[in-house]
Regions:
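N-acyltransferase acceptor-side catalytic subdomain
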Residues: 1-135
């Protein structure tokens, strides 16, 4: 069973789960590393959310976003212009599709927009993202 979770409070349990995800991810971008994102999240405590996909209570995908007015952007935009989603090594295309569909539905429900600044088009998940975005 897959569940999309929106975290408004990033506590120690969240960071332990995120660190495990990042260490076991397909693309371990240093700009998505737990330490740097935790540092940034502490500077924008009321503006940061994490969107996670859970499969059997384990985090298999995540992104951290910062909200200004009605616009979400990658939290990592504070340091880099190359942005990545984080997916566990054993994440299936079905998991990734579920993650992106849930993410885009969440943005629509919030009557918000999301800015994906320089998403890594070469990343293995990108074709699934394009298909979801085209729906």
């Amino acid at each position: 069973m897959r569940d999309l979770v929106i975290d408004n409070t990033l506590d120690s349990f969240f960071w332990a789960q995120y660190a495990d995800l990042w260490h076991n991810s397909k693309n371990r971008s240093p700009f998505q590393a737990p330490g740097i994102l935790q540092f940034f999240s502490q500077k924008y405590t009321n503006s940061v959310i994490a969107i996670r996909l859970l499969r059997e209570q384990s985090t298999v995908g995540a992104v951290l976003l910062k909200k200004e007015k009605n616009i979400y952007s990658f939290l990592s935009d504070l340091k880099t212009d190359a942005n990545f989603f984080v997916f566990r090594n054993n994440c299936s295309d079905g998991d990734i599709d579920n993650f992106f569909a849930g993410l885009l539905d969440f943005i629509k429900q919030q009557h918000s927009a999301v800015i994906f600044n320089n998403v890594a088009s070469w990343a293995g998940y990108f074709p699934v993202f394009e298909k979801c975005a085209a729906k």
